[in-house]
Amino acid sequence: METFNFSVPQDITVGKGSLSKLPEIAKKLGGKHALIISGPHLEKMGLVKKAADYLASVDIKADTFTDIEANPSVTTVEKATAKYLESGADFIVAFGGGSPMDVAKAVGVVAKYGGSVTDYEGAHKVPGPIVPLIAIPTTAGTGSEVTAFSVITDHSRNYKLTVFSYEILPKYAILDAELITTAPASVAAACGIDAFIHAEEAYVSTAASPFSDALAEKAMAHIGKNIRRFVANRNDIEAAEAMMTGSLFAGIAFSFARLGNVHAMSHPVSAFFDVPHGVANAVLLPVIAEYNALADHGKYLTIYNDISPIPAYADEFEPMMLVDAIRELCTDIGIPENLTIAINNASKTGTVTKEEIESKIEPMAVDAMKSGNIAVNPRASRQCDIEMLYRRAL
């Protein structure tokens, strides 16, 4: 066994109705004034006000910032940072899906150390602790409440930059399954499959360890056996709890084992065409699972048995059975059949032709190759391989 290390330095509260613990946790943090960073959907539903009211119950003031898009931009981080500084807040509550989480982490850095989020792009460029952060996810998907990553879109480059630093891990996380029951089916599907891919890619990563494998296996079992049920009925609290727990385990797993070609390739798709992150991942997954099958050394069987209604045994299993099972799962939960459909579904300017998409394949592949996730994908990949995979996904 190779040497590996791990540290999970966060305080995580899990349980139905645990949003009510926010005042207690904020007091523990020592905060007097919060900026709640969330999204417009939660604001309309009254959940942002509910969080603010919880804080007010212990005399903690709360301002809000909810102007956040699906793939948050450098400009959004600048606006949210300005709101934080103007408000006089001394801690942040990240309340929502992956987008508010990413923005909150970036604001925590820039508000503390100045400059632009682009100054912290890459690994370990955050000089020290950031503004204290409480993370409250409302989707079972990103795992961002337990990861050391913030992903922000730089439209000047059509590029999704990543800030990677253990300094940006939220100090506290609250996982309340009641909060994810409000998600539309399409969001539940995209976020749920994203969480599954976090676990799957961490599991087959060349950087995987016994620790990350244990978490990834548990995550895949929780998500794979409940995602169809949860997408069908978001009020199924038992399925919601399983999805949220699975997302948590997957987030910790990939924090240590990294990801792979799916995430490396999906970020450029979102940057160039504004496809939601989870959808881009899901469309690419079967194509890359087929590509990686050559490198499988037994883990595909475990993954298959987590998502297939009919279990298989080692003596009858073929890796392509997993690829077929992934396609079946994606179809069942309403994921677009291919990248062309996903891009057109996301388009705000009319039809995007296959030729237009193909013209972006080379620059997307160039950007994908910049991702550190390529290096831990189980099958080695060159730029020409990435271009080929994009074409297969069309």
Task: Give short role names for the model-derived ranges.
Residues 202-328:
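Active-site segments that bind and position negatively charged phosphate/pyrophosphate groups
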Residues 19-22, 44-47, 74-75, 99-105, ...:
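Short glycine/serine/threonine-rich phosphate/pyrophosphate-binding segments
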Residues 20-35, 54-58, 86:
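Glycine-rich phosphate/diphosphate-binding loops that line cofactor/substrate pockets in enzymes
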Residues 310-394:
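C-terminal charged capping/lid subdomain of soluble metabolic enzymes
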Residues 43-115, 229-240:
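N-terminal small/polar loop signature for handling phosphorylated ligands or for N-terminal nucleophile
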Residues 1-29:
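N-terminal amphipathic/basic leader segments beginning at the initiator methionine
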Residues 112-208, 299-302, 306:
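A glycine/threonine-rich phosphate-anchoring loop and its flanking beta-alpha core
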